[in-house]
UniProtKB/Swiss-Prot annotation:
Gene label: atpI
Transmembrane segments: 40-60, 97-117, 136-156, 201-221, 222-242
Record's protein name: ATP synthase subunit a, chloroplastic
Assembly: F-type ATPases have 2 components, CF(1) - the catalytic core - and CF(0) - the membrane proton channel. CF(1) has five subunits: alpha(3), beta(3), gamma(1), delta(1), epsilon(1). CF(0) has four main subunits: a, b, b' and c.
Organism: Capsella bursa-pastoris (Shepherd's purse)
Family matches, as HAMAP family: ATP_synth_a_bact
SUPFAM superfamilies (alphabetical): F1F0 ATP synthase subunit A
Task performed by this protein: Key component of the proton channel; it plays a direct role in the translocation of protons across the membrane.
């Protein structure tokens, strides 16, 4: 009994020691000019982009009148993105389908790559490879693109009259309305970053403590929540664009 107890204690201590070695925020940098660039984020982002471009090429390489399974799948994805865009933006959704679709697919594949691709087997001098959306720089960049998109949508539809929304329904709300436009990208970026980072950390901790069986359901749950996060981001982006074009909150 004492031997069993000692073995369990040893396993727990070893697991905790491994967990203590898990570090968040370690980065491998490239020096480009006078700037430091997060190399691992670029590497994983390029892999995700290559997957998306490769899939698109395969989908449109030989289109059939009677769709094949692969063509059916991509047509279903396109219809889904069009429905999301139309629901949130309205009748003028057409020009925004490529943007919303790109956001959704990039985030979806990025999130899933963190669970399905063996990034950890590639050793870097510092830090490690992970899903692109595991890095706050990626999620902030996506959120800023969304902000630029809804400002462009509003200005292209209404011109400078777009800014009159900041004093509606009363000028007293001017500071709050301005603050709202700053909190939108913040909420988008931190929600996505926090969920993906937390999911990967939970899996790392469980694998360190219990290498078999137990982490598997958590990984499946992570895949599900990763897909939901991509949908939430794309839906909110479309809603913000529609809101800026309609001019109501």
């Amino acid at each position: 009994m004492n031997v069993l107890s000692c073995s369990i204690n040893t396993l727990i201590k070893e697991g905790l020691y491994e967990i203590s070695g898990v570090e968040v925020g370690q980065h491998f940098y490239w020096q480009i000019g006078g700037f430091q660039v997060h190399a691992q984020v670029l590497i994983t982002s390029w892999v995700v982009i290559a997957i998306l471009l490769g899939s698109a090429v395969l989908a449109i390489r030989n289109p059939q009148t009677i769709p094949t399974d692969g063509q059916n799948f991509f047509e279903f994805v396109l219809e889904f993105i069009r429905d999301v865009s139309k629901t949130q933006i309205g009748e003028e959704y057409g020009p925004w389908v490529p943007f919303i679709g790109t956001l959704f697919l990039f985030i979806f594949v990025s999130n899933w790559s963190g669970a399905l691709l063996p990034w950890k087997i590639i050793q870097l001098p510092q830090g490690e490879l992970a899903a692109p959306t595991n890095d706050i720089n990626t999620t902030v960049a996506l959120a800023l693109l969304t902000s630029a998109a809804y400002f462009y949508a509003g200005l292209s539809k209404k011109g400078l009259g777009y800014f009159s929304k900041y004093i509606q329904p009363t000028p007293i709300l001017l500071p709050i309305n301005i603050l709202e436009d700053f909190t939108k990208p913040l909420s988008l970026s931190f929600r996505l970053f926090g969920n993906i980072l937390a999911d990967e950390l939970v899996v790392v901790v469980l694998v360190s403590l219990v290498p078999l069986v137990v982490p598997i359901p958590v990984m499946f749950l992570g895949l599900f929540t990763s897909g939901i996060q991509a949908l939430i981001f794309a839906t909110l982006a479309a809603a913000y664009i529609g809101e800026s074009m309609e001019g109501h909150h």
